[in-house]
Amino acid sequence: MRLLFLLLIFLFPCLNYGQEGQTRNLQEKHFNILFIGNSYSLDASADLPRLLVDMGVAENEYCVYCAVQAGASLDYWWKVYQQGEEIENLCQMGGTKLADHAWTLAELLHEPWDVVVLQQASAQSNQLKSYRPYLQNMVDMVRRESAKPDVTIAFQLTWSKYFSADKGPYGTNGWRSIVETVQQISDEVGLTTIIPSGTVIQNLRRTDLNSSLYLTRDGVHLAYGVAQYAVALACYETICRPLTGKSALDAPPSDAAKALQPDHKGVIPITDDNYKMIYECVRAAMANPYELISPDAFPSPQSAQRNAAPRQRSPIYDIHGRLLRYRAPGINIVGGKKVFTPLRH
């Protein structure tokens, strides 16, 4: 996992949309956004600079950075702050570049950030006790150290994993447990700005855009293309739209957003045919961060054909030869052939 994280750290600076060589302190008039977390922060913010540019924000008028560490929890970041440690990985995602020196968390927060985004480590995201007292401590710390008294503190509700991941939470039940935890802790702490990334992804998993790895590229991290773009849209609509006054959902995706091709590993491309489905999943999550769309919200052409023309169904047996009414999770015998049926979510 640490090796994978280091690879992510290496790749993301190569993908930034920033002003190369421009190093200075941030300006008050900029849109300045800081994520504090881990590789999920990188996934969420990867396409955010592109969206800002698409919405007419000049590259020298915004700044997006991620302070990240592999698997870092709220507890980890609180200790980094308390002990005055230098941030190991500070990634420029796009826009103005910060001064190139070692930063402590307190020093970083003295820059005029408009928004600071917090999150819990994925493996602890549904464990209420892991948030206490660290989320409250982090919120108080951001408010105390921030150069802007009106800084917005947002919390990213992260996504559940595919079942191949070493640790959960997994699938729909995992998403639900994350939601219940975030609802309770955000009420306790008084956080009202929630980025519903996990709900966006779970909505997409109920459509024909779902993939064999549940819209991840490795069971954990978001698939390039559709998944990263959808979560970036949720980030933009939650924390950037109040600053720009423009919705990214009012116009089709740019050619740059559609540039990734499916022949690259882990890519689910954005197309003229699927972007409206992506937008609707984002809109639904923005309207109801703790609820999912109906599985029938986006009937596929294939399902419409099946409904219009009933067909003869082959008998289904389990591996012990028992006749089944429906396919069960696991190995089924259909038409004399072994067929693996995954657990549905």
For every predicted segment, state its role.
Residues 3-12:
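Sec-dependent N-terminal signal peptides
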Residues 19-57, 269, 274, 278-281, ...:
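N-terminal module-boundary/linker segments of secreted carbohydrate-active enzymes
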Residues 34-36, 67, 156:
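Short hydrophobic segments within beta-strands
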Residues 42-132:
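Conserved SGNH/GDSL esterase-like catalytic core that processes O-acyl groups on lipids
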Residues 219-222, 226-299:
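Conserved catalytic region of serine esterases and O-acyltransferases that act on ester linkages
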Residues 294-320:
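Residue-level detector of functionally pivotal "anchor" positions at catalytic/ligand-binding pockets or at interdomain
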